[in-house]
Amino acid sequence: MSNKAVVFAYHDIGCAGIEALLNAGYEIAAVFTHADDPKENTFYGSVAQLCARKGIAVHAPEDANHPLWIERIAKLNPDYLFSFYYRNLLSEPLLATASKGAFNLHGSLLPRYRGRAPANWVLVKGETETGVTLHRMVKRADAGAIIAQERVAIERSDTALSLHHKLRDAAASLLRDTLPALAQGKITETAQDESKASYFGRRTAADGKIDWQRPAEELFNLVRAVTQPYPGAFCAVGEHKLIVWSAEVAKGNEGQAPGRVISVDPLRIACGQDSLVITSGQRNANGLFLGGPQLANELGLVDGSLLRGAESGRKPRRTRVLILGVNGFIGNHLSERLLRDDKYDVYGLDIGSDAIERLRSHPNFHFVEGDISIHSEWIEYHIKKCDVVLPLVAIATPIEYTRNPLRVFELDFEENLKLVRYCVKYNKRVIFPSTSEVYGMCQDKNFDEDTSNLIVGPINKQRWIYSVSKQLLDRVIWAYGAKGLNFTLFRPFNWMGPRLDRLDSARIGSSRAITQLILNLVEGTPIRLFDGGEQKRCFTDIADGIEALARIVDNENDCCNGQIINIGNPDNEASIRQLGEELLRQFEAHPLRGNFPPFAGFRDVESKAFYGAGYQDVEHRKPSIDNAKRLLNWEPTVEMSETIGNTLDFFLREAMLEIADRAKQEAR
């Protein structure tokens, strides 16, 4: 029986995995690892050195998912792929090269603590048990069926390093017991319970910052989660950095404010609850490792000193969010949602303000009326000033793609590229609105952010200029990401709701489909169905969409960094004809129905008669929302009929205001 394996491995758990495969009689055709980062403290075993000793071919490509590497791996005819602490996700085409399956060893008891740095996170969260899991690899990270698990107790004395050693030993034990059965096909697979899943992103040195307002128990867990060989928990003391390597919890805080030094021997600091005794640490990155009392002396601390940033009751600075296009459909709803949290200052610019009038009196909302193509100095200053930038300005109505293609390109690509470059210049996080249009005529059943092809029509079909402008900017942002830009791309799928457009926009043909259909009902003109109205879309309620976007802005645990996220409702798929029929049903039942003319019927129209010869439509557009579920813990909840009802009601009330205005003018 052939048991040929290709292995993706790093860390000394990667070494343990390779040793276990060899001991179980597997043939290792090749190993893929990472080159060590000279800026990283490599306290763990070297996979490359182990392979050199064992005479195993080893590679460290920048991208193992590149088609050339996939082709080379396929030629090895592996029965299995194994991933042991390899840091990159393996693509579906790569996973498919293994005839008997691909398997990953993860450092937690899945489905809990999916994602990065699970050994650190379980300590941060104060868990008393973790473990290792061998599971089948699928497209979604850490989501495949479980093959085997081994539990590991977490002692109060454990640090990230000691826990890592326990996990390494547990991994060796689990693989020793499981790999022979896997080779014989005698394994049982258990699907993961998604209701119990949790996901955590990567950790950085900045995550070790100590907030003395927190309970001492939380800070104790933080200290042991990031102590040596990691960068350590830290806070500022005057002009110095205090790095805490070990600590203990002491009951009570003597009624002192958080951050106040209760005593220097032992070095005891008051916390939001109880107090923390610092038993060892150092002053600054190049300082000596010292015990608590000597450390206090080095830092000039005395009883009653208050550590910087620890003033009692001091609230953290609100995150500054810059929304360009704040008066638009997404911009005004997102502003309202962020302001509800009271942890954001929202700065906005747009050429109008009708949709945000309800927000202008809010003390945390700051608006300037202006054009992004003119107010470049104001924009650059506010990008430099703010923490998060959302460039929402775009022409996003289909008729403009064929009527004004160059204007679409100038605004949607050229002007937005300037904004992205400012974000690069000032190292600011950008959340960029891509679009479901980038998928074009993709034939996948569900459009996937990471694997679906982006397919558009010929050059003479001008309608694709919007799609390719957005796609090109997506690619530019992705390339800047490789150079350090912090970004998230989100792709809305047919969001609908109040304030989507204006009826006046529909009168000149420059609106979304539902607004045009409502205008037909309001004015008693036939509802035009282009090319039969059989094109299907997945309609998403604005409340659902904004909730997902707000979670991207929150970016808990940095989970959205460098990600592309579809935001849509695959369960709300309907044709444009079905949309029109549901609109009509609700229109006829609406209390304001009597104020409008009789229904004039449906009329089939060729799309080119309205959009022009450069138009080309798409038959279906359904998102995969796996990334949104995994990263944001989000799913849409609003049914399409409710969304249609809310949208219809908004526009009918707008129409009633128009009727009242006309009556006033006629009475003069």
UniProtKB/Swiss-Prot annotation:
Keywords: Antibiotic resistance, Lipid A biosynthesis, Lipid biosynthesis, Lipid metabolism, Lipopolysaccharide biosynthesis, Multifunctional enzyme, NAD, Oxidoreductase, Transferase. GO terms for biological process: lipid A biosynthetic process; lipopolysaccharide biosynthetic process; response to antibiotic. UDP-alpha-D-glucuronate binds at residues 396, 401, 435-436, 463, 494, 528-537, 615. Pathway: Nucleotide-sugar biosynthesis; UDP-4-deoxy-4-formamido-beta-L-arabinose biosynthesis; UDP-4-deoxy-4-formamido-beta-L-arabinose from UDP-alpha-D-glucuronate: step 1/3; Nucleotide-sugar biosynthesis; UDP-4-deoxy-4-formamido-beta-L-arabinose biosynthesis; UDP-4-deoxy-4-formamido-beta-L-arabinose from UDP-alpha-D-glucuronate: step 3/3; Bacterial outer membrane biogenesis; lipopolysaccharide biosynthesis. The record marks D142 as: Raises pKa of active site His. Residues 1-307 are annotated as: Formyltransferase ArnAFT. This is Bifunctional polymyxin resistance protein ArnA. It comes from Pseudomonas fluorescens (strain ATCC BAA-477 / NRRL B-23932 / Pf-5). The lineage of its organism: Bacteria, Pseudomonadati, Pseudomonadota, Gammaproteobacteria, Pseudomonadales.
